[in-house]
């Protein structure tokens, strides 16, 4: 009976885990759809912003190239605040460490800025002297404005660095995400010098260009953030689906084991009862 009770309690525990993983899978799937919509909107906005910049940039001597008397490179590493998403965080951490080694082998001094505390927790002991800041509670970022407030709150000035790179898990499909690095500064803006007409700027041209360039960089980073969020939710959907399937398989085995144990217990009881009757009859 003790064995049956232990099996029953274990089955109850597995059923509870199964419900939890199923709910988490449904929540992550809903969040994934929301992030995909935000990502599509951000890409459309970025496309229009790129058109404006491509139309109005008429000189190669713009402020988008950043200062040339600096050796520091800023790496913005995006992960998640929570686990239970497969190897999502492990992939970006492994990729980031490899990329940092590559930059340092070229004589570059690397500084780190983290979105999501999981990658920070995995790397802080090794790169503590290089970390500028870490942003946790990133699930509270619901739009571009809240994203900018997160960045401005850090006090990090991008113009201090000769280059700014963002490392994130790029979202391709629900089952395919890949660690990627994209260059934010110097900006890869197409330079057009054959405009049909020129424009008058108010305020001054360089001020307009500087504002547009900053907006361009922030939008690139925001899109990378959304790509990373989509990858996180996608990885969690797959991980929870796998966990749910595993609990089903485990529950099936436990039910079979429980039924066999109960059958054996019933058989044992019947044998004892029959043996008792037989012994009474013999008397």
Curated annotation (Swiss-Prot):
It is found in: Cell inner membrane. SUPFAM superfamilies: ATP synthase (F1-ATPase), gamma subunit. Signal peptide: none annotated. It holds the Pfam family ATP-synt. This is ATP synthase gamma chain. The gene is atpG. CDD domains: F1-ATPase_gamma. GO terms for molecular function: ATP binding; proton-transporting ATP synthase activity, rotational mechanism. InterPro entries: ATP_synth_F1_ATPase_gsu, ATP_synth_F1_gsu. Keywords: ATP synthesis, Cell inner membrane, Cell membrane, CF(1), Hydrogen ion transport, Ion transport, Membrane, Transport. It comes from Ehrlichia ruminantium (strain Welgevonden). Produces ATP from ADP in the presence of a proton gradient across the membrane. The gamma chain is believed to be important in regulating ATPase activity and the flow of protons through the CF(0) complex. The keyword Ion transport applies. It comes from the Bacteria. One of its GO terms (biological process) is proton motive force-driven plasma membrane ATP synthesis. One of its GO terms (cellular component) is plasma membrane. The keyword Cell membrane applies. It is a peripheral membrane protein. Belongs to the ATPase gamma chain family. F-type ATPases have 2 components, CF(1) - the catalytic core - and CF(0) - the membrane proton channel. CF(1) has five subunits: alpha(3), beta(3), gamma(1), delta(1), epsilon(1). CF(0) has three main subunits: a, b and c.
């Amino acid at each position: 009976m003790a064995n049956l009770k232990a099996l029953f309690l274990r089955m109850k525990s597995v059923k509870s885990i199964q419900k939890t993983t199923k709910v988490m899978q449904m929540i992550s799937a809903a969040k994934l759809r929301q992030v995909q919509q935000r990502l599509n909107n951000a890409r459309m906005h970025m496309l229009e912003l790129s058109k404006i910049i491509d139309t109005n940039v008429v000189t190669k001597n713009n402020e988008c190239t950043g200062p040339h008397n600096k050796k520091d490179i800023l790496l913005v590493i995006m992960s998640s605040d929570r686990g239970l998403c497969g190897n999502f965080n492990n992939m970006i951490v492994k990729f980031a460490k490899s990329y940092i080694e590559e930059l340092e082998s070229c004589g570059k001094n690397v500084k780190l800025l983290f979105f999501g505390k999981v990658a920070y927790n995995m790397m802080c002991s090794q790169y503590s002297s290089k970390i500028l800041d870490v942003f946790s509670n990133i699930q509270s970022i619901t739009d571009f404005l809240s994203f900018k407030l997160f960045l401005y709150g850090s006090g990090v000035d991008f113009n201090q660095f000769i280059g700014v790179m963002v490392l994130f898990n790029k979202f391709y499909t629900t089952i395919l995400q890949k660690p990627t690095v994209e260059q934010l500064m110097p900006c890869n803006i197409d330079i057009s010098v054959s405009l049909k007409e020129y424009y008058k700027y108010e305020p001054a041209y360089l001020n307009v260009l500087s504002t547009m360039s900053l907006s361009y960089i922030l939008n690139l980073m925001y899109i990378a953030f959304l790509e990373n969020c989509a990858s996180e939710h996608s990885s969690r959907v797959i991980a929870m689906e796998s966990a749910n399937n595993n609990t089903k398989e485990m529950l099936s085995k436990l039910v079979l084991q429980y039924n066999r144990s109960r059958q054996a217990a019933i058989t044992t009881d019947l044998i004892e009862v029959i043996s008792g009757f037989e012994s009474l009859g013999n008397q």
